[in-house]
Structure formats: C-alpha cells, structure tokens
From Swiss-Prot:
Main location: plastid
Origin organism lineage: Eukaryota, Viridiplantae, Streptophyta, Embryophyta, Tracheophyta
Positions of substrate binding: N100, T150, K154, R272, H304, S356
Maturation and modification: The disulfide bond which can form in the large chain dimeric partners within the hexadecamer appears to be associated with oxidative stress and protein turnover.
TM segment ranges: none
Subunit structure: Heterohexadecamer of 8 large chains and 8 small chains; disulfide-linked. The disulfide link is formed within the large subunit homodimers.
Molecular-function GO terms, alphabetical: magnesium ion binding; monooxygenase activity; ribulose-bisphosphate carboxylase activity
Protein name, as recorded: Ribulose bisphosphate carboxylase large chain
Cofactor descriptive note: Binds 1 Mg(2+) ion per subunit.
Function of the protein: RuBisCO catalyzes two reactions: the carboxylation of D-ribulose 1,5-bisphosphate, the primary event in carbon dioxide fixation, as well as the oxidative fragmentation of the pentose substrate in the photorespiration process. Both reactions occur simultaneously and in competition at the same active site.
Cofactor(s) for this UniProt protein: Mg(2+)
C-alpha cells in the first residue's frame, strides 16, 4: 500500500493526512496502514483477496513528507480509486476515508487535512440548492455583503416575543435574522408557533422597508421525516430560507433537505454546530476545510466559516483558504493557506461563507476587507446589544456596512 512510484490519476480522490506514528513505527509503515485500512485492507491476508483485483481497488500512499518544526509528524498523501465510492454520497465518502482508520494502534494521532475531489466525482453531486448568484437574484441584493443576526437569548423566549425581536431587527435594516442552532422545538417555544410568528414579522418588515427579508427557520429535528415536515411548513408560509445543523443532523439528512430546497425554491442556511469537536485539535481529527468541501457537495447556500476577528478561533490565511474553497470555481494549491491540492469544482454553485461569533460594528472595516462582497456578516450581540434596542442596533450595522462598502468603492480608507 506504500507505493511512492504511483502516478495519481485525474479521477483519484486524493487525501492529505497529518499522522503522528507511535514511537518505533516507521512513517512508511504508518502511511501504508492508513491507505490500507481506509480502502481494501484488513489486518491479515484473506483467501477472498484472490477473487478480486486489489490493485484496481486499493488506496495507495504515494508520498510522505515530514512536517516542518514538528517532531515525528508526517503528511501522508493517499490516492483512492474512484470506484471505492458511491456516487452522490458524502456519507459514503467519509465512511470510507475517515470511518475506521482513526482508532488505529500504529498511530498516536491522525488528522485529515485536505481532500482533492475530482470532477468525475463532484459531478455526481447536486451541490448547493441555489448558490451565490441565484440567491442574490432571489433577494435582489447586490454589491455588498448580506447582514444577519442571531436572535438572543438563544433559549427561553416565547414564540411571540421571539417574532417581535425578529421584526425589530429586520425593520432596522438587516437582511436576515437567524434561529440559534439549538432552537428546535422546545417546551417554551414549539416550532410551529415560532414559524408562524416569524412569518408575520417577515411580511410586516418587508412591507415597511420594501426589501426582501429572511429568517433562517431551523428545520433540524430528531428524525428526517420531522425535519422535512418543518421545511414544508416553512415553504407553505412563504419563508425564503430554512436552516439545518449539518454535522449533528448528519450528511444524509442534509442532502435530502438540500434536494427539497432546490426543488421548492427555498434557500438553505447551514450551521456547523459540533465542528470544533472534530476540527479543533491540530494533530487529530478532520480540518474544517474538509468539512466545508463536504458541505458544498452535500448542499447548502450559506455556511458558518469563522470570523478571523471575533470570539472564536480562526487564523486569517487558513480561514480565507477555505472561504475560497466554498465560493470559487477553481482554487490553486497553496500550502501557506492550508490548501494541499488544486481543486476544480467545474461550475458547481458557490456557498456564502457566514462570519459569525463575537463581532460588532467596530469589526466592520476588517470584515468587509477580509470577506469581500460574497459573504454574510452575522452580528448577534453586536445587534441586540445596542443600548437603544434591536432596531437601532440593526440600523448601526447597516449604516456601518454601507459606509465601508462606499469607502472601498471610492478607494478611500
């Protein structure tokens, strides 16, 4: 399984693993073990191996490089033949590549840093229900980032008070408000009541401002059937957008919801709750850029992508690396930004990155510069924390945003 002479094919799925072998285990052996365990291998030779062509189906570790500045850490590059994966299934792709290998005895730690998805595979996915351009056309909003706000306190408000908070924010000039990721259907606010009061807030604020407004109605639920029921109800109310927690809800549920949203003209906002459990450790887990690529394939029109400046962790260059992987069509390999492979999405629609978490108006110049126009800037406490209330907080955000955009367009600081 360690084959340094192997030339990768255009149809191979390529993976870059950061591996820390146990003391005494050579890097080549560890790399081969990763390739074997995540493809056709098992711990011993079995007679049924003779009934198939392992050469055709096995994963191959084709390169290993030591990580600069780290002791006993290596980047192992593994190529997987396309036929190992079911078409159009992120679930199957991740089950194969990261399903079993992370508990391996020969490794002290293992992290999936990046994946190269070949066009032959990405073309089997629908991708985002609508994408950046279609969303702008639906909302009739151009030439600036979109503004959002998560309604706080995230838990405990009644549906009517919740709807009022939504109305105040949208009236003040925001484009979107948002259910917090853990607002589903709790005793203090059942989902149907929330959807009804929020729809009222949407239409009232639209009538007043003459702008199209949205609220990310969280359709995440305990079963896929219940999730779809909520999405259907949101569509019947005339809401423009629903929301899903894609890691806790799962990729299968997410892809089903994305198909429904595309067929029925709903935008889909994706929250990444639970991502830090998977991506925060530097030497073990899965890097968020892989989770972001997986989401673009599974389907979503917005996804949270860190802020570079707020309360949550995120390094600037690396964050911009996966922001580009979400938005752009073709992304060159660039190790300084953590991009291990050139990725060609062959015209799959892009995803709006959402900057959210501890940001406020003072961050606006930095945010517009870092994220550019195709992004959603989401201020929770940064809107609702305004001493005069939600609507003035929303006004402050909108004014700050338009000032920054105007300054940029006129070439002023």
């Amino acid at each position: 399984y360690y084959t340094p002479e192997y030339k990768t094919k255009d149809t191979d799925i390529l993976a870059a693993f950061r591996m820390t072998p146990q003391p005494g285990v050579p890097a080549e052996e560890a790399g081969a073990a990763v390739a074997a365990e995540s493809s056709t291998g098992t711990w011993t030779t079995v007679w049924t191996d003779g009934l198939t062509s392992l050469d055709r189906y096995k994963g191959r570790c084709y390169d290993i490089e030591p990580v600069a500045g780290e002791e006993n850490q290596y980047i192992a590059y593994v190529a997987y033949p396309l036929d190992l994966f079911e078409e159009g299934s992120v679930t199957n792709m991740l089950t194969s590549i990261v399903g079993n290998v992370f508990g391996f005895k020969a490794l002290r730690a293992l992290r999936l840093e990046d994946l190269r998805i070949p066009p032959a595979y990405s073309k089997t996915f629908m991708g985002p229900p609508h994408g950046i351009q279609v969303e702008r056309d639906k909302l009739n909003k151009y030439g600036r980032p979109l503004l959002g706000c998560t309604i706080k306190p995230k838990l405990g408000l009644s549906a009517k008070n919740y709807g009022r908070a939504v109305y105040e924010c949208l009236r003040g000039g925001l484009d979107f408000t948002k259910d917090d990721e853990n607002v589903n259907s709790q005793p203090f606010m059942r989902w149907r009541d929330r959807f009804l009061f929020v729809a009222e807030a949407l239409f009232k604020s639209q009538a007043e401002t003459g702008e199209i407004k949205g609220h990310y109605l969280n359709a995440t639920a305990g079963t896929c059937e219940e999730m779809m029921k909520r999405a259907v109800f949101a569509r019947e109310l005339g809401a423009p957008i629903v929301m899903h927690d894609y890691l806790t809800g799962g990729f299968t549920a997410n892809t089903s919801l994305a198909f429904y949203c595309r067929d029925n003209g709903l935008l889909l906002h994706i929250h990444r709750a639970m991502h830090a459990v998977i991506d925060r450790q530097r030497n073990h887990g899965i890097h968020f850029r892989v989770l972001a690529k997986a989401l673009r394939m599974s389907g979503g029109d917005h996804i949270h992508a860190g802020t570079v400046v707020g309360k949550l962790e995120g390094e600037r260059e690396v964050t911009l690396g996966f922001v580009d992987l979400l938005r752009d069509d073709y992304i060159e390999k660039d190790r300084s930004r953590g991009i291990y492979f050139t990725q060609d999405w062959v015209s799959m629609p892009g995803v709006f990155p959402v900057a959210s978490g501890g940001i406020h108006v003072w961050h606006m110049p930095a945010l517009t510069e870092i994220f550019g126009d195709d992004s959603v800037l989401q201020f929770g406490g940064g809107t609702l924390g305004h001493p005069w209330g939600n609507a003035p907080g929303a006004v402050a955000n909108r004014v700050a945003l338009e000032a920054c955009v105007q300054a940029r367009n006129e070439g002023r600081d």
